[in-house]
């Protein structure tokens, strides 16, 4: 195998990369010194993609997942674009995913799906599990530039909403996924915490002992907003008006024209109607 270098043309006129071509060349040359020739390397307006899948598989993911996600994000949500390159590793199997995560970043306590390291501008994706986590992490990669202060509950709610999604006509839509049973279990066992408590969590608490439930709760709150056609409005108004004292509760009550208690009651009734066919 040899390195294949190609530039994927952006399919959208909605976004323009601020990143200089020379930065891509430098990033690719640096990457070549760290990985072997089982990888192909390609460039996208914001990413350098290193993949040990077949060139055809890599191109399909680049076109059908990465490029389409970018189109949807800028049509539906984001205005500001990244000013730095993120490297996306696409791994064909669990073995090579774990090997290179350890070799390159000394990471060994891994999600089986993949993960994003914002501080190092890199994503490592185990594509054998599907592309859902790729879209999740892409959401984070763009949100951190468009809405730098985004709180964890909303950042992870939005990202996890798109773990199972459609990308059609520059619109992204999330569907029921594997996180639903955890939320329904909490409701049935009277362990459910209110939306008001969820949106008041600081980031450390969100990612703490109850993170699996917090992710599920945030995901389905975002899906609930999506189903009521207010998610995009909430994102933009919350982003534009955000400061450290911003109260998501006020924004939710405004877009639903209901009290937070009424929203919670409607949300719980809706969640109970959902089914996950896992």
Spans of model-derived segments:
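Short, flexible segments with low predicted structural confidence
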Residues: 20, 30, 130-131, 206, ...
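Charge-dense, low-complexity intrinsically disordered segments
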Residues: 14-18, 52-60, 212, 254-257
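Acidic/His/Gly-enriched intrinsically disordered linker/tail segments
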Residues: 100-125, 148-278
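N-terminal low-structure segments adjacent to metalloprotease catalytic domains
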Residues: 1-42, 257-278
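Generic beta-strand hydrophobic packing signal
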Residues: 3, 86-88, 198
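Juxtacatalytic substrate-recognition/specificity segment
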Residues: 36-151, 168, 244-251
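Proteins with a high burden of low-complexity, intrinsically disordered sequence enriched in S/T/G/P/A and R
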Residues: 1-13, 17, 26, 49, ...
